[in-house]
C-alpha cells in the first residue's frame, strides 16, 4: 500500500518533529518501520511528482509533466510500463483510490461517456478517483471509466475557456460563497466554494468536500476486502492538506491551526482507520506500507482559510527552506517511511 499525502510538509508530522500538530497514526508507520530523513519527491508540484512515482521516470523527461488543468488528457503513454502494470504482471490486483490529477481521456473527451484512457489503461485493475483535484472542475468521482452517480438526464459540461451562460462564479457572485478565494479559484461554484474552471450540470454526481475523506476511506477498505485473499497493490492517494481545506464537521477545531491543521488531523485519522482495518483482517504482517507526500507544504494556496494567520509557532517545513513550488529543499524533501511489521526492523535512516 502506498499512502500519498498532498502538500504535506516535512514538519507537519509529529514523527518528524512537529510539536503543534500531532499525527499519531502516521507516526505509527514511522515508529514501527523505517523513518527516512532524506526522502525526496521528484518534483515540488503535484502532477509531475505523481507521474514520476507511477511511471518510474523523472518528470523533466516528459514534456507535459506540469500542473495539469482539470480537463487535461492522460499524461502517461499507455504502451509504457508503470508501477501498477509491473505489479499486475507479477500477479497483484491493483487499485487506486483518491486524488488523481494525471489527466484523463483525450483532448475531446465527453465526460458523460466512457472516460478513457485513464488508470485502467496504465495498469490499475480498479479505480475510484477524483477527476482532477478538489479545487478544479469537474467536481466528481470517476469509478472505472465513468463518472460515479451521473444522471444521463442531467449531463455535465466542462470548460477551461469560458463560463456557461447563467452559471454563477466566485468572481461575479461572492455572496454565494462559504469559502472565499485569496487568489484565482474564482470560477464555477460548487458546495459554496469557487473552483478553477467552469462546469454545468451533473448535479447528482458532484462530490461533497466534507465527505471526501470518508468516501476515499470507504472505497479503499472495500478494495482491500475484495482482494484480501490474494496479492494486492493499493495506491491510497489522499487529498489533504491540498486546498480547499474543508474537513468533515467532526474534525473542525481539532487543531489550533484552522482548516489546514484540521484536515491534516482528518488525514491522520484516515491512515489510522486503514491500519486498524489491516490489523482486523490480520494482513499487517503481510503488507508493506509506504507513506510519503507528493511535495512540500504551502499555507495560502488560493483560499482564505487563515492558514498564515493561525500558523503560530508551527513550522510545516521543519527547519528546511522553501515549500511547494520551490526548488529549495522543502519543495521536495518530504516525509517518507516504510513499514513491514515483522520483516523490517524499526529504525531511522
In which residue ranges do the predicted regions lie?
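Formylglycine-dependent sulfatase
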Residues: 1-349
